[in-house]
Amino acid sequence: MFLNVLLLFLMGCQSAGTRSDPIPWANGIEILRSQSQVRVPAIALLRSGWLEQAVCTPETRTHESVFAILAAPSELHAALLVVGGVPGAPGAPASLDSPARPPEGSLLHITMDLDGSVHRLQDLIVDDRSGDSLQGNFVFAGSKMVEWNGAIRYLADDEGSAVGLVTFGDELVGYSEPRSASIEHARAIFRPNGLLLPPPGTEVVLIFTVCPEDEG
């Protein structure tokens, strides 16, 4: 899997030198290098209930996410590299022997585009503690490479963790506030904003923009 990501990255760099924006990518992804932007086709999921993910992949965490992207997280990872994103590391919730650790990596501005109507991802999710939209940020954490049955795998591809809210430690993109995924340690606080989200099954485009360092 690491080799696949590297090949996609190198192909993207080569394409960027010879082609103008947008650059077609795997599974409908489009890259706009001039805008440090990656556009990914997605399907709307929940408009009610509780969330642990913001964005997953089909047939993974669709019961706890507002969108499913129609591409592998490793493909999005490679595309973010092409537009200048720098992966860091997923966060970790607090434990008995260590404090919480927020995710690290390039700051990302994520929006949903539905036929020209654009909303920030933070505004599509409600923090139940305040009743308002999310106040934190999303960062390019980069998930993890793990060995399984003798093969190296990209963990977010297996788990479907494209954009996390609670902290599983496998997220491609993490939310800036580390929070335990266990309800025994932290109550559920994230829920969909049904006033802004489209009906389940609606086709949308998610836009990932790498922010300049001085915005971090």
PLM regions: where:
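Long, low-hydrophobicity ectodomains and other hydrophilic envelope-associated domains
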Residues: 19-216
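Sec-dependent signal peptide recognition
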Residues: 1-8
